[in-house]
Amino acid sequence: MQSNDMVVVVTPSYLPEQSEPNQHRYLFSYHVQVRNTSAQAAQLISRHWVITDAEQNVQEVKGLGVVGKQPLIGPGEVFEYSSGCPLPTPFGTMKGSFHFVGENGVPFDVRIDEFVLSMPQTLY
């Protein structure tokens, strides 16, 4: 199994009802879809996110699974989840990786390309 056998799509959005701009608190959600395009199952073991705000402050988040799960994703299956990210600025980015183990026992990482977290009508 190769890393390109797992396709990861992330859709971010701004949550104005949970944000407090006057207190420098901007909350974003992101929806993640992981599609297994291979002929074998793989288990998502851990995640690593690199979160950068508009002032170039970087926070790294590492942990087991996602939203408390370590899903086994079968051939042709899709696993989806949503989570959130608070920032002190109205703009930022996220990128990272997921660590998997294929049913053959071979570990591999899937890179998640950088995506933008932005309050609507905010330019940086």
Indicate where each model-derived feature is located.
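Low-complexity, acidic Ser/Thr/Pro/Gly-rich terminal tails and inter-domain linkers that flank the onset
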Residues: 1-25
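Short, solvent-exposed loop/turn segments enriched in Ser/Thr/Gly
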Residues: 25-31
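Asparagine-centered strand-capping/turn motif at beta-strand->loop junctions
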Residues: 34-38
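Short acidic, flexible loop segments centered on an aromatic residue
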Residues: 40-59
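Short, surface-exposed linear segments at secondary-structure transitions and domain or protein termini
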Residues: 53-56, 68-78, 117-124
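Intrinsically disordered, low-complexity Pro/Gly/Ser/Thr-rich segments with frequent PxxP/GP/PP motifs
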Residues: 59-91
